């Protein structure tokens, strides 16, 4: 190889060396810029996904908290009635629960179940007996939760006593936030989560009061709302305790555990984060089998319910790093154009300013030596000084 280089002309050697040096320098500069761009883009993307997850969590948590606040307020009103000796007749219950449901913007149904000994003047049509519990069940529906009015009482359906939140509230005698469930009442099905509080007369449990929060509304306004999209093909999922889908872009996932839908080991860090009641950003393989980045925000529903939900905002890395591909192409074109321009200009300079002048000097010297050796009769013409540099002096 060295032999081949020695055979090259001076200008070619110089051009080759300059080209290699320029290419290496530009390449290093491009790699540094690429690395810094990716690092910055990665940091900003993770920050954005985390902030978006936090923003949605800050929208959803108040919905649930509002429901519990209304329930506990009504719970307090009923307790005060009992302390004052006011009978819990149909009118009192109707007014209390109707006001509760009408105030809520997210609940579709509210219900109160009073054990048989504590329901005064209960209507026979409201009497239910199920799961070893007997009493009077009153169910109320709000036809339009976003507006005042529209609340009315509907027929009692004993399936309400099958709600896990109702059963747990009776057994544990505390406020319970249930699991995502598909509810069918009055022949209409919808996705919901139940919030239930116990009712006491002194220290004696006399029944429960609950609401069915309409998750379909949350899905439409938050999960499926395209205005909430930050990257192409991203999606929002709301996970209840245990990583169960409460809302997602695919309604068929409702009620399923995320770990059952996506069995890739990388998902473990997300399920662990929810189990530890923490938030963060994680790189993982999403349920579509693509590399993704997910922002997770975990929050507790109300106070001391022990129910922790999470919002997962996931975006494929191909979408997150899409700007980087544009930067890379632009950089590559710029590097090649710069390299070609620099090499062309330097080659032109070497050929005109160095090689041509060196050739003239070399020819003049050879002719001068011929004159000294009497190989020619007349002296060669002297060189013209065209530059005040090493070759021109």
How should each PLM-predicted stretch be described?
Residues 353-380:
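Membrane-proximal alpha-helical signal-transduction linkers
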Residues 15, 19, 33-63, 67, ...:
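Juxtamembrane interface helices immediately C-terminal to a transmembrane segment
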Residues 90-104, 208, 212-254:
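Solvent-exposed, extracytoplasmic
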Residues 83, 101-174, 178-189, 244-264:
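Extracellular/periplasmic ligand-sensing ectodomains of membrane signal-transduction proteins
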Residues 188-225, 247, 293-297, 307-323:
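Conserved beta-strands of PAS-like sensory domains
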Residues 200-201, 261-329:
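Extracellular/periplasmic juxtamembrane segments that couple receptor/chemosensory ectodomains to their
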Residues 50, 54, 61-95, 103, ...:
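Extracellular/periplasmic ligand-binding regions of membrane signal-transduction receptors
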């Amino acid at each position: 190889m060295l032999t081949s280089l020695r055979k090259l002309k001076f200008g070619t050697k110089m051009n080759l060396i300059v080209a290699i040096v320029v290419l290496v320098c530009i390449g290093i500069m491009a790699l540094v810029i690429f690395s810094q761009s990716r690092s910055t883009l990665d940091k900003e993307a993770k920050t954005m996904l985390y902030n978006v997850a936090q923003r949605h969590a800050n929208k959803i948590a108040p919905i649930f908290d509002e429901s519990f606040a209304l329930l506990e307020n009504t719970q307090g009103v009923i307790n005060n009635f009992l302390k004052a000796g006011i009978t819990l007749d149909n009118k009192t219950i109707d007014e209390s629960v109707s006001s509760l449901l009408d105030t809520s913007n997210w609940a579709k149904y509210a219900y109160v179940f009073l054990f048989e000994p504590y329901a005064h003047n209960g209507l026979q049509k409201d009497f239910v007996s199920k799961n070893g519990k007997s009493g009077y069940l009153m169910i109320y529906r709000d036809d339009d939760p976003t507006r005042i009015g529209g609340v009315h009482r509907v027929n009692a359906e004993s399936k309400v006593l099958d709600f896990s939140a109702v059963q747990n509230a009776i057994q544990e005698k505390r406020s319970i936030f249930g699991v995502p469930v598909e509810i069918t009442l009055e022949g209409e099905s919808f996705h919901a989560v139940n919030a239930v509080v116990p009712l006491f007369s002194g220290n004696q449990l006399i029944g429960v009061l609950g609401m069915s929060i309409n998750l379909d509304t949350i899905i439409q306004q938050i999960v499926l709302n395209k205005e909430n999209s930050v990257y192409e093909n991203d999606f929002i999922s709301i996970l209840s305790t245990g990583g169960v889908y409460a809302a997602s872009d695919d309604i068929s996932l409702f009620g399923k555990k995320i770990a059952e839908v996506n069995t890739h080991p990388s998902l473990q860090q997300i399920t662990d984060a929810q189990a530890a009641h923490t938030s963060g950003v994680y790189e993982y393989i999403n349920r579509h089998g693509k590399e993704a980045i997910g922002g997770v925000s975990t929050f507790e529903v109300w106070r001391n319910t022990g129910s922790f939900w999470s919002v997962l905002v996931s975006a494929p890395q191909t979408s997150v790093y899409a700007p980087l591909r544009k930067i890379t192409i632009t950089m590559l074109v710029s590097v090649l154009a710069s390299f070609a321009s620099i090499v062309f200009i330097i080659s032109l300079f070497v050929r005109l300013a160095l090689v041509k002048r060196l050739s003239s000097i070399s020819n003049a010297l050879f002719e001068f030596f011929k004159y000294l050796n009497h190989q020619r009769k007349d002296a060669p013409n002297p060189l013209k000084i065209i530059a005040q540099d090493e070759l021109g002096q």
